[in-house]
Amino acid sequence: GKKFNVIKNGIDYSKYRYQLKNRTECRKSISVADGYLVGCIGRLDPQKNPLMSVEIMKEISKLNATAKFVFVGDGELRPQVEQKIKEYNLEDRIVLLGARDDANKWYSAIDCLIMPSLFEGLPFTLVEAQAAGLSCVVSNTVSGDANITGLIEYVDLNQSTKVWADHILEACEKERLDTKEQLKKAGYSIQDTAEQVDKIIQTSLEKRVQC
């Protein structure tokens, strides 16, 4: 067979790294000053299991009087998510932002990213979250390869929402980490990726010239 090269998606660390300015601006835009802010960043579709996220937030709201939740993304399940929020009287605790051009800034605003997905490979959202030094609580369907920095905690989908809520509130208390070197070492630097692509193109051109 032909030889091929595997190149990882590079990430612009400067775009996703934690920035207090982004945290302040994003939180102010949804009237959240202090207190924990938990978030889902991704599509509102069956795979991402957003209805379970609402169930988890219902449990978190019992355990923490000030915690709030934000969905960054849109999708086919939005009407059901809105209905569930209303059913649980969580309108003052959950914000639906829809699809955003500034999703990268919200990694600085939230204290924990959750992903109770029914199935996943290696979602790039988790690479972005780790670039922001953000703690993540995800389902055990997510690939173990996603845990580049040790910031990801895996919870069995069959566990109760109370178990999920406990893990999430613990994650919210964790300090942010500077993950730039870890991501670079793992091959996610956009500069390194660009150099790899350039090298492959140059090698390919040289081979053609020799033919």
How would you label these PLM feature ranges?
Residues 99, 118:
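Aromatic "clamp/platform" in nucleotide-sugar-dependent glycosyltransferases that forms part
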Residues 135-139:
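Short hydrophobic beta-strand element within catalytic cores of glycosyltransferases
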Residues 175-211:
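A charged, aromatic-enriched C-terminal amphipathic alpha-helix characteristic of glycosyltransferases
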